[in-house]
Swiss-Prot record:
Record organism: Cobetia marina
Protein name: Alginate lyase
GO cellular component, one term: periplasmic space
Known catalytic reactions: Eliminative cleavage of alginate to give oligosaccharides with 4-deoxy-alpha-L-erythro-hex-4-enuronosyl groups at their non-reducing ends and beta-D-mannuronate at their reducing end
Gene (name only): algL
A GO biological-process term: alginic acid catabolic process
One Pfam entry name: Alginate_lyase
């Protein structure tokens, strides 16, 4: 530009425009990936629905639960059958709520029966009114249950909130109650898991960040979104040059299983961040891709993990298709190799309550296979 006066006049204007563009993006309402906007498949009527199961009692007690690895050494890799049963028994109402919410939302998005929606909202509203899962009296397993439950519920709820069918339009009072409860619980989850030392930051922190990301979108809270992104960055910066997570390698014979378990929350956070204008794919030189590739290679040849930590790997968990639900968001973030796509197709649909239900319907709807796995 040859005219210096004009250049000086324009400079502040261009700066203002750039600042305005940034502010507009920051102020734009948070949203989930496009698949969450899907309308209800069809609206059925009549008496073919399953009815509403008995509501699990809202859990308002102390979040003090026994760990299924009780008595194990530092590796936390040996299952204690007795304490696992005690854990399952004492947390039964919570997991019933999680599973029931995901199941009913999936059914409603398929069948559109009003009673399916009402059942879900009644459960969530009752737990919200009781201020459930908010106890400040908790141990590590207790605060873990809180963030798992929040992630399950908030990610299922998002499918209702953002659906183009607007199922919550006639249920604004319940929606406000539920969202206020999610919001308060997310604040507690942040408090529970914030700023842990790196040696104690592992898959639990990633799952906590996922629950906060899902809540951020459900309640349009940018502060929660930013915290989830911060925790994501801490997580993927733990991935080494070969795609290993040092803290998960400590899990001895379960190291590969725990590397795989770390992937769903990280892939979901990256996917949700991406749609809101924050590209996390290249963080730590594409660490998420490196981790995913390492796990897929390990599933083919577990000896890679045995060579790394000296322990023969327990492959039991990795025989369950739904443990690979992370492939749905992962293969939209990165270009997956043909053999990975083929593996994904064989295992679809991916339905997992901790990620809000049917991820294939959200990320790869043309390969959804009806009721399989519901």
């Amino acid at each position: 530009m040859r005219n210096p006066k004009l250049k000086n006049l324009l400079a502040p204007t261009l700066l203002s425009l750039a600042m305005f563009a940034g502010a507009t993006q920051a102020a734009a309402p948070l949203r989930p990936p496009q698949g969450y906007f899907a309308p209800v498949d069809k609206f059925k009527t009549g008496d073919k629905s399953d009815g509403c199961d008995a509501m699990p009692a809202p859990y308002t007690g102390p979040l003090q639960f026994r760990s299924k690895y009780e008595g194990s050494d530092k590796a936390r890799a040996t299952l204690n059958v007795q304490s696992e049963k005690a854990f399952r028994d004492t947390t039964k109402d919570i997991t019933t709520l999680e599973r029931g919410t995901a199941k009913r939302v999936m059914q409603f998005m398929r069948d559109g029966r009003p009673e399916q929606l009402e059942c879900t909202l009644n459960w969530l509203t009752a737990w919200a009114k009781a201020d459930a899962l908010m106890s400040k009296d908790f141990n590590h397993t207790g605060k873990s249950m809180r963030k798992w439950a929040l992630g399950s519920m908030a990610s299922s709820y998002i499918r209702l909130k953002f659906s183009d069918s607007h199922p919550l339009a006639q249920h604004q009072q319940e929606a406000q109650l539920i969202e206020a409860w999610f919001s308060k619980m997310a604040d507690q989850v942040v408090s529970d898991w914030d700023n842990l030392p790196l040696e104690k930051t592992n898959n639990h922190s990633y799952w906590a960040a996922w629950s906060v990301m899902a809540t951020a979108v459900a309640t349009n809270r940018r502060d929660l979104f930013d915290w989830a992104v911060k925790e994501y960055k801490v997580g993927v910066n733990q991935v080494d040059a070969d795609g290993f997570l040092p803290n998960e390698l400590k899990r001895q014979q379960r190291a590969l299983a725990y590397h795989n378990y770390a992937l769903p929350p990280l892939a979901m956070i990256a996917s949700f961040a991406q749609i809101n204008g924050v590209d996390l794919r290249q963080e730590n030189n594409g660490a998420l891709k490196r981790l995913g590739d390492r796990v897929l290679a390990g599933v083919k040849d577990p000896d890679e993990f045995e060579e790394k930590n000296g322990k023969k790997q327990d492959m039991t968990d990795l025989k369950e298709d739904m443990k690979f639900a992370w492939l749905e968001p992962f293969c939209t973030l990165y270009t997956c190799a043909p053999d990975v796509i083929e593996k994904k197709r064989d295992m679809q649909p991916f339905k997992t309550f901790r990620l809000g239900g049917d991820l294939t319907k959200v990320y790869d709807p043309s390969h959804e296979k009806g009721n399989k796995g519901s």
